[in-house]
Amino acid sequence: RFYTKFLNDIGVVDFDEPFTKLFNQGMINGSDGQKMSKSKGNVVSPDDLVRDYGCDALRMYELFVGPPELDADWDDRGIEGVSRFLNKFYKLVMDNKDKNVEADRELLRVRANLISDIEQRFNSFSLNTVIAGFMEYNNKLNELSKKNGVDKETLKAFVILLAPFAPHIGEELWEALGESGSVF
């Protein structure tokens, strides 16, 4: 930022900020509330977490732990919750992917709300609430699935929205839904 200000002052560039939006993220501290440090012994091994929960669950938990601009304390129960959500969504897709379900008014409303809510939350950098929204809509779709099932277009829309946060599961579910190429 300093260089841009300097270059603007000497007339090399005609703008004084290097970007239109600046976002500074917080830090994830150890479960004791202190900065993670090997010397303090409060470091969480990402290798162990990826082995136990998968990299998509780890990525989503880091985004879900709180507002991204604030510091947060690590909590193993949080990654377990995100892992349960991903497993529940995976099961929802697998249980409904071959059903020939027409989207009724309620499913269409849920799909439209999902897309609108997630887009709004994402554009305001409220990534933790994006993931909370995924969980809310997953619960709604599971309820609707018990009645008649969930149509493929709604499942595909959810997978597309989820993929930037859980790309490995997103790709696998995209393929399971019969789509070719990448979900991206």
What are these model-derived regions, one by one?
Residues 25:
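Cation-handling catalytic/transport regions enriched in His/Asp/Glu
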Residues 2-3, 12-16, 48-184:
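Helix-rich, typically C-terminal accessory recognition domains appended to large enzymatic cores
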